[in-house]
Regions:
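Beta-strand-rich N-terminal accessory domains
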Residues: 1-49, 59-85
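Compositionally biased, intrinsically disordered low-complexity segments enriched in polar/Pro/Gly
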Residues: 2, 156-161
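Acidic, contiguous internal or C-terminal segments within carbohydrate-active enzymes
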Residues: 80-126, 164
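Conserved small/polar residues in nucleotide/adenosyl-binding loops
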Residues: 162-168
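Short aromatic-acidic-glycine turn motif
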Residues: 127-134
Length: 169
């Protein structure tokens, strides 16, 4: 673990660590004391991550949107540019706590210009990477869970205004 330069997003219920190249490398979900889903910062081989693969000519910069906990990772090259905005929502509510903290993480991919080419790598490793990961892929979402604990499931939803191709089983 040579590089500890991570962005942090969270909502007072849990938090994620996002590397300089836009990979979620640590996330316990849905709560701080829950088992990890992504832990590649500890084990690159089987820890799990959720990120982007771009060619070597991309320049990647990262900063926070001013006055927010929204992390912006910008990918730029001669062929195109896009930005990824990462955040976890926290809403005001009328209950005794005053806040609603859903177990949700958002990764908004925004096209800036050109024709950027990238690959999304989604490799969850639920429950501290103990057991086989089961992925159910549908046109609307990817469901993932650990083979020995099928009650704790995570869903990755993809919404796109352009053509999006998800692999099938």
């Amino acid at each position: 673990m040579n590089n500890l330069n991570y962005g942090v997003i969270g909502n007072c219920r849990t938090a994620a660590l996002i590397s300089q190249n836009g990979n979620i490398e640590w996330l316990c979900f849905p709560d701080f004391d829950s088992p990890s889903i992504f832990a590649s910062m500890l084990d690159r081989e089987k820890g799990g991550a959720f990120g982007f693969e771009v060619s070597g000519d991309y320049r990647i910069t990262q900063n926070y949107v001013p006055h927010t906990n929204i992390l912006s990772t910008q990918f730029s090259s001669d062929e195109g540019e896009f930005v990824v905005l990462d955040y976890m929502p926290c809403y005001r509510s009328q209950d005794e706590t005053g806040h609603y903290l859903p177990a949700e993480l958002y990764r908004y991919i925004h096209w800036i210009k050109g024709k950027p080419r990238f690959k999304i790598n989604y490799h969850p490793a639920p429950n501290y990477a103990q057991g086989q990961v089961i992925l159910n892929i549908t046109p609307q979402y990817i469901e993932s869970y650990c083979s020995f604990d099928n009650k704790d499931r995570q869903y990755l939803y993809a919404v796109s205004y352009t053509h999006l191709t998800l692999p099938t089983n």
